[in-house]
Amino acid sequence: MKVKTLLLGACSALALAGIASAETLTIATVNNGDMIRMQGLTSEFTAKNPDIQVEWVTLEENVLRERVTTDIATKGGQYDVMTIGTYEVPIWAKQGWLLPLDNLGADYDVDDLLPAIRSGLTGDDDKLYAAPFYGESSMVMYRKDLMEKAGLTMPDAPTWEFINDAARKMTDRAAGINGICLRGKAGWGENMAFLTATSNAFGARWFDENWKPQFDQPEWKNTLDMYVKLMNDAGPQGASSNGFNENLALFQQGKCGMWIDATVAASFVTNPKDSTVADKVGFALAPDTGLGKRGNWLWAWNLAVPAGSQKADAAQKFIAWATSKDY
């Protein structure tokens, strides 16, 4: 009996020692649906890597940007893996703020990454500094039943003129239906992401060839006038508080006739477990104004290792798992 007790004690001590010696990765991410799914699958990773534990810091998009930017610029070292956008990667890599992902494993197929996305994550030294968790563009998502009720047919490639007309005709305030839901929450990754893409369709740009700001040009005025009038006439109340997640919830609840936003939303608006209108959703290209330019973007949410992390090998193991083909 004493021998058995001693053996059990030894086993318990070894187990506790194993837990104590495990590295804990602190991962900062955005509170988007796909990242929530990733967190739910964490046990799959830790089962294969029992020497690594994972601690999540999940933040609203604007807060995430502020926190990770402050941390990496000050070399705070709070996070071992950061979720960052395509915009930040080349800039931060050039500053020496990110570690190159040169230890993703022999099985990791870098050539499987879409060239347009991969090039945005590659530094001047041709090394990969972040791996895409997912890439996206933007598109029109709409209620087919409400479009039909309004006596309209959504073109595969709509114009902003059509979108404006359809949004107003689909609006039914008494029934709680907004003709269109668009980002209004302040933030360069919220309303400014949408407005910048939209302005492209109107021929606007931020700077000219001499880096002179162009915000006082008529193309920007046309963009903003259209946006404000459309949101007042056909948008939801409190639109200035709505970003991606808020508009997603409104669309899933059947309160939006149309929504122009990230293509990644398709799986959420068509999932009957989450969406009350899952079987009524159609898709179309982002709108244009006849200039041959559409209001769509190229974006990716990526996983990167800050230079201040002391757990780079474990961090790259996690990134390799989360961005692999098997995942």
Residue locations for each model-derived region?
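Glycine-centered hinge/linker elements that transmit conformational signals in sensory
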Residues: 166-169, 209-241, 282, 286
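Extracytoplasmic/periplasmic solute-binding protein
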Residues: 127-133, 138, 162-212, 256
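Short, well-ordered beta-strand elements
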Residues: 23-32, 52-57, 80-81, 129, ...
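Extracytoplasmic/periplasmic substrate-recognition and gating elements
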Residues: 47-48, 146-150, 225, 229-234, ...
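Extracytoplasmic "Venus flytrap"/periplasmic binding protein-like
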Residues: 43-116, 149-151, 250, 254-258, ...
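Short, polar/charged alpha-helical segment
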Residues: 32-53, 141
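Hinge/lid segment of periplasmic solute-binding proteins
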Residues: 85-137, 161-162, 178, 191, ...
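Extracytoplasmic "Venus flytrap"
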Residues: 25-40, 57-61, 136, 189
